[in-house]
Amino acid sequence: MRRLEPARQQYSWGSTSAIPALLGRADDGSPWAEAWYGSHPAGPAQVAEGGVLSELIDAEPERLLGEDIIWRFGRRLPFLLKLIAPEQPLSLQVHPSQAQAAEGYALEDEAGIALDHPCRNYKDTNHKPEMVLALTRFQAVAGFRAPRRAVEVLAGLDSPLARRMRRTLRLNPTRYGIRQVFSDVVSSATRPSPQEIDALVTEIAARFEAGTSPSLRVDSNVVKMADTFPGDPGIAAALLLNPVTLQPGEALFVPAGSVHAYISGLGVEVMASSDNVLRAGLTAKHIDVPEMLACVDYVAAPPVRPAPEYLSRATRAYYAPVDDFELMVTTVVAADGRLPVPGRGPRILLAVEGAVTLVTQTDSQTLAQGEAVFVGADERSLFVEGEGTLVQADVP
């Protein structure tokens, strides 16, 4: 087992206190948006004995990853585990499929765009499906609503923008209508002016305050977005998306192509090891609307909220329809004694509550809240004892 120190990501939308509180660190007043526990080159975790996790894996891939993982994914850790703590809405974004990521990366390389250039879309060749597990109440928007539900949200609004959006969806209540409205709202040639967005927000804020909203969550999200990014077209686009509220212990899966934005809360996120993000609004970062639109799945569907499957009294698993990762949560009390932790290496385990001791054939490590370890494939069995909760990312 190797203890890990996460890579800190100080994105402007991050809370200054949520992650430090979990990790037992002082709040230094700067955003701590994400804590990365993985080997991605954009933020590899530090190993307590020295160096970073990616170097450790590069030195002994067969032992730490195992032949099966190398055959399936190459000589790299296929997943990335994070803590994520949005205090302000994230960008309206989508992640590419495997084929789109590989093609986009190659084209940008051919064009000579440096990996660290702010206008680079594709930082790697991998797709980025992801799943977030709420540790506190967690708000998001994810995936397109059914057109009729979007029309209901727009009903009663009299601003020119609301009328245009409503008219298009009524004339074409299909995914093609959704595609037209969404692309019209975010594309540079057709997007509404800041004044039109402000007029729409004024109407929505008024009905929210009056208690006459057809969807309190949608209107609340719009008001939050407008407070942070006034006049941004992404505010109008969010009216087309499903509102999501996760309570602690609930999960949301976001597949490639799903337009989404996290809004507030603290969660554990696991994903394919990638940093590919295509944005269309609600951000000061690089926006490439045509590339983003090319990656979007316009099929309306409810959010994917995986139900936990109980593998034992202590462990529940959240399965995603991808091969790169799965997420497990194990909660133990002292009376349980020593219990097996399902799964296999390579895996990363993060203590999110209490204090627990992990035991392998060759090692024993006690983790306080906020501490994490990497367990290689050579450690075939893992046990836990103590009083606390562990979140584990591994490969199915």
Question: What is each model feature region?
Answer:
Residues 205-273:
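Acidic, glycine-rich loop-and-beta core segments that form the ion-binding/anion-interacting portion
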Residues 311-314, 326-343, 361, 368-369:
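Conserved short histidine dyad/triad with adjacent acidic residue
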Residues 47-48, 59-67, 231-247, 341-342, ...:
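A short beta-strand-loop-beta hairpin characteristic of the jelly-roll/cupin
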